[in-house]
Amino acid sequence: MPKPTISYSLNGLPAAAVDSIGSLLEILARIRGIVLTEQSNDETASIIISAPDVHRLVVGSDDSHYDSTTLYIEDFLNRLCEALDAVGKKAEAGAFRHALQLYHTDRELGALKHGESVTNRQLKNDSFEDLEFLVEAWLVALNSEESARKLPAPLPVKSPDTRAMTLAEKILAHHAFSLPSSGGLKSGELGMKHGMVSIGELPSVWRNDRFWLAGDHTVEPRTYDQPRVRELLNGLNDAKQEFKMTENQGSNYTILHTEFVRERAEPGMLALGSDSHTCSAGAVSCLAIGLGAADVMTALATGETWIKVPESIRIDFTGEPAWYIRGKDVILYILKELKRNTFAADRIVEFGGLGARFLSCDARFAITNMCTELGGVTGIFVPDEVTNTFVSGRPQSKYKSNSIYFQPDKDASYAATFQIDLTMVESFIALHPSPDNVVPVSEKLDMSFEGCFIGACTTTEEELVLGALVLEAGLKNGLGLAPGKRMVVPGSIPIVNSLRELGLLEIYAQTGFEQPAVGCSLCLGMGADRAGEGENWISSQNRNFKNRMGKGSTGHICSAATVAASSFSMRLTNPAALLAQVSPDRYKALLESCQSYKNRVRKVKSSKKESVKRSVSVMPSYVEPYLHFRSPLTEKHTQMHAPSGGEGEQCGNLDIIESKIYALGDFVDTDAVSRDLFLHLSDVSGETMTSGVLTMLEIIPAAFILESPTDTLLGSHALEFTNPDFRDKVRQGMRVVVAGKAFGCGSSREEAPRALKGLGVQCVIAKSFSFIYGRNQPSIGLLGINIADDRFYELAKTGAGIKIDVPGRVVRLEGQNFPFVLDDMELSLIKNNGLATAYKKYGKNVFALLCNTKSSLRPSELAELQLKGVSDGMQTSLEW
């Protein structure tokens, strides 16, 4: 049977339409190898796409604002899609339709920076280029998807020999290339995982449609003229063009996490991001983990990473909260009860229970967003009817078609379990300088403020709507505005659009709230917006560390409703009285209007009907993970050696480290941030700031990293404010740092271990490491060891001699031996001077080659490995 062919005719079309259609057909041929021929008089073809009739199009179109060229092109592309469907090229037809839909969607309604105002669009040269880019990017996405490893179909029922697993363990097991046991995963085990990456920078990418990028931290229209900001803006655009990115949000369209969770993340996905608040995507039951830059960039290039499965704790919600209690007050209550870096430290926080059905996905966003403040690796909600309704209500099918609904086994093992009664949640405030220093608002009334801030990623759309209604109630009561600064910064342009359409932005304006561009703003205090020295602020952001909002400032965090109520008098005010005047029905109606605005997209002809209406709330159909098991390798295929030369190379022989100790305490933080410190950081006026005060123990000041310093330069500033003798002591031979609990807690930045390594530190020993910091150490080539024995810390005084036998997995101190666990993957990374160097050496096969070492354990021992477990000093290691 002859192969179906498609020919076309462009007779009578204007030159602009012919040129644009020709360019699109050339892209189709170049990327997908589908060649259409222009029809000749004697040619026969299975399908002929004739030239559109412009008179018919103009008369029959309801798009009177479109010029004829626009209509010619769109009609031709619709016919092309039908022809591609007819010859079995449905994927290509879908790519064209999706590109057209994005192209015709208003940027403020979710076009992800590609669209202009629908009512004003006319196809001009620059917009022709936009359409061509979209088509090319989505056709390239087909190629990258086909070449990437595909996840297997999940199983309908659980195999009888599969061990009980938590939700996180099931997601990791399903994404794993191979497992250390045929029975599934449990805490402490290692596997190689697929990763959907949210940010990074490498000369190639694994999949151009799985790379989410947004400029939010320091880029802002008021700073666009600054050299460093221009460099970042150019980098955003270069990445979009070079990688043909389908998910490049540009600058000031969305905070990184906001639209990613609202429109892209799906249940059962695995997401990696270079920001500690990546955990926000747990709101839609996506396992989202923040990692350091080296980890994320390598995953971006390879689509692979390695993960030691963390333990999980379980939080079950009970009861029904008051209608005005949103996610921010819930997570503050959890922080109040559990405290920071305690039960959740280095663990995944799994949320569920009967009360979870009263928590919207916006509320869940605020809760999972602040799991990093709780000290957790990430947070994730068990998917339910709330999740299913939210995801299935997305207007575009492409962004709801990859969902996999797992649920934890009833007999899964948790490190700890808790119940949170939602009826006990009230309006709370976390007092400076810690997110867990939480008290009821009613206990601290009349605290005075110089500023009020409603914004940051943790402040969701529903919180912004409620804040506006509280302000409206205050205006109706005739409340005056005391002197002070007020600012509102929604998390994305689509949210801004909804608030504007509903008249709520006008309410914020009437009550004195400035409205700068979308971004992190005061939550970070490193861009155009900064709290002044000595100022006291109340904020709906997620962190209230010292100097977080600006040098010398203090901040307290609470819900948007509490900030709004306090903004009239500039004194802490319980919002209850104003909330009592807000109609719950009106609030609900406004949220439904927000959803309808989000779903207001221009329809594109399709071979099948698609609804953009929110579906009826139903429980999802749960499935079980498909498990890949491969027996441990018995032979070495690769012998790896640390590369010679290069900055920050490990000193001496890694097998045996003999040195002296420099002792630190608990909670050494990478992110107790002094934002305006030193070293060539310019403010909005262009002045250079060269001083600052750091009162909490941190490894490296955050603001310093903006200048992309070397490891050695970072090391020259390590702990310089809190421990001024540290650098000299290390240089004099104290090259082993001993610390307590949660060493490296804070952000995902890898500059902290880089600073220690650059100074000459050979090893850090701690009772526990923050998850991200603990990952960053081997990824940059620095040895880190966990020892839980209290006797060790009684002996480990500054200046004491210490010997570390890495092959023997034992530390010798004051005549006593202390065994430790070090996985082969971690050791391989360290011996190769870190992940970046290993990637340069091995390329996209880096993980396969790093894993090709002989296991020191039998399969039965592999299956029994526990997180950070030590048994009689036995070396424990895993392979895939």
UniProtKB/Swiss-Prot annotation:
A Gene Ontology BP annotation from the UniProt entry: L-leucine biosynthetic process
InterPro entries in alphabetical order: Acnase/IPM_dHydase_lsu_aba_1/3 (IPR015931), Acoase/IPM_deHydtase_lsu_aba (IPR001030), Aconitase/3IPM_dehydase_swvl (IPR015928), Aconitase_4Fe-4S_BS (IPR018136), Aconitase_4Fe-4S_dom (IPR036008), AconitaseA/IPMdHydase_ssu_swvl (IPR000573), IPM_dehydratase_rel_enz (IPR050067)
Keywords for this protein: 4Fe-4S, Amino-acid biosynthesis, Branched-chain amino acid biosynthesis, Iron, Iron-sulfur, Leucine biosynthesis, Lyase, Metal-binding
Keyword Transcription: no
Cofactor: [4Fe-4S] cluster
Cofactor binding summary note: Binds 1 [4Fe-4S] cluster per subunit.
Pathway annotation: Mycotoxin biosynthesis
Biotechnology usage: Pneumocandin B0 is the starting molecule for the first semisynthetic echinocandin antifungal drug, caspofungin acetate. Pneumocandin B0 is a minor fermentation product, and its industrial production was achieved by a combination of extensive mutation and medium optimization. Inactivation of three of gloP/GLP450-1, gloO/GLP450-2, and gloM/GLOXY1 generates 13 different pneumocandin analogs that lack one, two, three, or four hydroxyl groups on 4R,5R-dihydroxy-ornithine and 3S,4S-dihydroxy-homotyrosine of the parent hexapeptide.
Reaction(s) catalysed (UniProt annotation): (2R,3S)-3-isopropylmalate = (2S)-2-isopropylmalate
Record: residues binding [4Fe-4S] cluster: C457, C520, C523
Keyword Membrane included in the entry's annotation: no
MF terms (GO), sorted A to Z: 3-isopropylmalate dehydratase activity; 4 iron, 4 sulfur cluster binding; metal ion binding
Family indicated by similarity: Belongs to the aconitase/IPM isomerase family. LeuC type 2 subfamily.
PANTHER family: HOMOACONITASE, MITOCHONDRIAL, HOMOACONITASE, MITOCHONDRIAL-RELATED
Protein name, as recorded: 3-isopropylmalate dehydratase large subunit gloJ
Source taxonomy: Eukaryota, Fungi, Dikarya, Ascomycota, Pezizomycotina
Gene symbol of the encoding locus: gloJ
